[in-house]
A protein has these predicted regions:
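Residues forming the flavin
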Residues: 18-259
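Iron-sulfur (Fe-S) cluster-binding segments and ferredoxin-like electron-carrier domains
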Residues: 1-24
Length: 259
């Protein structure tokens, strides 16, 4: 919407250009760990190794502080690693950045839950400052009749479990296994997360996948006179949707029936 070429022809995709530049930078070795010449002697604890924690820790280490990142999971990345499927974003993109951050001096403490493995009082005693960079992992619920029936799951439970499965991470024995194999799947929500659930369900061998979208079907062509910061409405089909999902528009879920 921000590219003026869109008024007359195909616009230039800024995201694609930026991604190509970054990939080339890593391939050619142009992106290297920065050498920190001056240290402050200050120690900072960063809680959470998601996008915010990674960005924060790199800025702090470059400012000369000693930084330790505490992460409850086995690996860093947050929802980039555990929420976005591998078929949509390869995790090497995260790994190469974490390698750079670690080479600059950031220490990562994995499988560490604050309040369980280490207390806030201990952190306050050991560090000069503590930064909270935890992400939001609480999904938005659907308060309708039948919501508590078996077989209804949050994307926040479904997607991270599959990501751990494909990366050969151990899934907790206390966690209910969620698989779409040989099932007729309904995905409520027409956004990116819904598309991720579609692609994951298809790869798990679902019999069918239907996506319900509360909004009406948008036009196939956008209003080219509408420019940034407005978002032009246009029918978009993700790669996951094109793999075989049925899409139903203008549908509001009012209840769920079954056993």
């Amino acid at each position: 919407a921000a590219c003026t070429l869109n008024l007359y022809e195909e616009p230039v995709s800024i995201k694609t250009i930026e991604c190509a530049i970054i990939d080339r930078g890593f391939e050619e070795g142009w992106i290297q760990p920065q050498k920190i010449d001056k240290k402050t002697g200050k120690k900072v604890a960063v809680i959470g190794a998601g996008p915010a924690g990674l960005a924060c820790s790199q800025q702090l280490i470059r400012a000369g502080h000693n930084v330790t990142v505490f992460e409850k999971n086995n690996k860093a990345g947050g929802l980039l690693r555990y929420g976005i499927p591998d078929f949509k974003m390869e995790k090497t993109v995260i790994d190469r950045r974490i390698e750079q951050i670690g080479a600059e001096g950031v220490i990562f403490s994995y499988n560490t839950t604050i309040g369980k493995d280490i207390s806030m009082d201990e952190l306050k005693n050991q560090f000069d400052a503590v930064v909270l960079t935890g992400g939001s992992e609480y999904p938005r619920d659907l308060p309708v009749e039948g919501r508590d029936l078996d077989g209804i799951h949050f994307a926040m439970d479904f997607l991270p479990q599959q990501n751990r499965r494909v990366s050969y991470e151990k899934i907790s024995s206390d966690t209910q296994e969620i698989l779409a194999s040989d099932k007729d799947v309904i995905v409520i929500g027409g956004g990116d997360t819904g598309s991720d659930c579609i692609g994951t369900s298809i790869r798990q061998g679902a019999r069918s996948v239907t996506q319900l979208e509360i909004m009406p079907i948008p036009p196939e062509q956008e209003d080219k006179s509408l420019t940034w910061p407005n978002w032009p409405l246009k029918l978009r089909t993700s790669s996951s949707q094109s793999e075989g999902a049925l899409r139903d528009f203008s549908v509001m879920t009012q209840s769920v029936s079954g056993e």
